[in-house]
């Protein structure tokens, strides 16, 4: 994950000191791109240990179309607790928009299913996109989507995906985002009998929170290790039938975790 270390170094070197919604303050740059060849390994950060269970369960939660943290909490995942209301709901965020996008006419659109149909019937389509940024629902969301739009591309029977992320917490959030979408590419490739290609990541406001800067400086002193491999142990009948036990990470030997405070 040399790309990630390079990004941190750039933010520290040329970032702009900005105020932010949480009051913490950030060191920020605008516009950044990274590319990960999934054939060369699973891009799970090695310069600090990542909690892979949180990454997988969150992705499965999104794919269920769920917006209540009960499923996450049942599986001992607490990453969304700070944004849930008393009933455990976080509003119409990722899962709702991916699986049940509401139209002005009162219809619901399953964007993920539509992409799967296109990948199988018309893989050269330029319309294989999923958006989480439903303007009419933003005010109902406890936390508006940070990773807002992703698009699929097929060539030579190989599946690639590009993500646009409007706001990126580089120290805490970005390692999760990279791993999560890489897993999703593996899952969809398996379902559509495709090979995995590239994951391309584009960030808008890409930042280190001020209380993470010293932690990030510690992290960039660590030399990235060999990437692990992701194996999916079985092929369910549909994309929506995977469970946590279907995924195996092989050869993950990270440095110890570096804990940072979440800005809410």
Curated annotation (Swiss-Prot):
Reactions mediated catalytically: dUMP + (6R)-5,10-methylene-5,6,7,8-tetrahydrofolate = 7,8-dihydrofolate + dTMP
Annotated active site: 146
Main location (coarse class): cytoplasm
SUPFAM superfamilies to which the protein is assigned, alphabetical: Thymidylate synthase/dCMP hydroxymethylase (SSF55831)
PANTHER family: THYMIDYLATE SYNTHASE, THYMIDYLATE SYNTHASE 1
CDD domains: TS_Pyrimidine_HMase
Protein name: Thymidylate synthase
């Amino acid at each position: 994950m040399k790309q990630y270390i390079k990004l941190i170094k750039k933010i520290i070197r040329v970032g702009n000191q900005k105020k932010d919604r949480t009051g913490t303050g950030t060191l920020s740059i605008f516009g950044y791109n990274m590319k990960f060849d999934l054939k060369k390994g699973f891009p799970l950060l090695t310069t600090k240990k990542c909690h892979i269970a949180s990454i997988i369960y969150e992705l499965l939660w999104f794919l269920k179309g769920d917006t209540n943290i009960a499923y996450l909490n049942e599986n001992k995942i607490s990453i969304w607790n700070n944004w849930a209301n008393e009933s455990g709901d976080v509003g119409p965020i990722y899962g709702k928009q991916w699986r049940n996008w509401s139209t002005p006419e009162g219809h619901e659109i399953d964007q993920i299913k539509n992409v799967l149909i296109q990948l199988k019937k018309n893989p050269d389509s330029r319309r294989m996109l999923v958006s989480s940024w439903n303007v009419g629902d933003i005010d109902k969301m406890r936390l508006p989507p940070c990773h807002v739009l992703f698009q699929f591309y097929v060539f030579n029977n190989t599946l690639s995906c590009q993500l646009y992320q409007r706001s990126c917490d580089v120290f805490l959030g970005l390692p999760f985002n990279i791993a999560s979408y890489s897993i999703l590419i593996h899952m969809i490739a398996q379902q559509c009998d495709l090979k995995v290609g590239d994951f391309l990541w584009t960030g808008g406001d890409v930042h280190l929170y001020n209380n993470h800067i010293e932690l990030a400086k510690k992290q960039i002193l660590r030399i990235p290790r060999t990437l692990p491999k992701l194996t999916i142990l079985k092929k369910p009948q549909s994309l929506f039938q995977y469970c946590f036990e279907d995924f195996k990470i092989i050869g993950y030997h990270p440095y110890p975790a570096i804990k940072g405070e979440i800005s809410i």
